[in-house]
Regions:
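Short, solvent-exposed loop/linker segments at the N-terminal edge
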Residues: 34-39
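Short strand-edge motifs at loop-to-beta-strand transitions and within beta-strands
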Residues: 78-82
Length: 117
């Protein structure tokens, strides 16, 4: 009987942690902190949970600080894509804000580089 109570308690606790977890950036393309040979056509961000499209956004700025993202991102499930305007070599800054389906807001940022060192 004690074993059954312990197992049920552990499962209940694990479920509670999973339900209340925030979403995190799982991976990005271009990769976080990477250097790519040529400017990508889009930035793709994949998160650990599905996103609420109406409350999620991404902004990409180029080497001169001007925005190079081409409008609203496309969101499907846990993935967000945004097209990029033509831009040259240098450092790019990606800043994202998302609301996951569990209603938790998360934000973050990273850089990637186009061209040489």
């Amino acid at each position: 009987m004690r074993t059954r109570i312990l197992i049920v308690s552990l499962l209940w606790a694990a479920l509670g942690v999973a339900v209340h977890a925030h979403t995190f950036l799982d991976h990005a393309s271009p990769l976080v902190g990477s250097t790519v040979a040529s400017a990508p056509r889009e930035v793709s961000l994949t998160f650990t949970q599905n996103l609420e499209a109406a409350f999620s956004s991404v902004e990409v700025t180029g080497p001169n600080g001007a925005r190079v993202d081409a409008g609203k991102p496309q969101i499907s499930g846990n993935t967000m894509h945004v097209g990029l305007k033509a831009a040259g070599p240098g450092s790019y800054h990606v800043r994202w804000h998302v609301l996951s389906v569990d209603t938790h807001k998360t934000e973050g940022n990273f850089t990637f580089r186009v061209g040489g060192p």
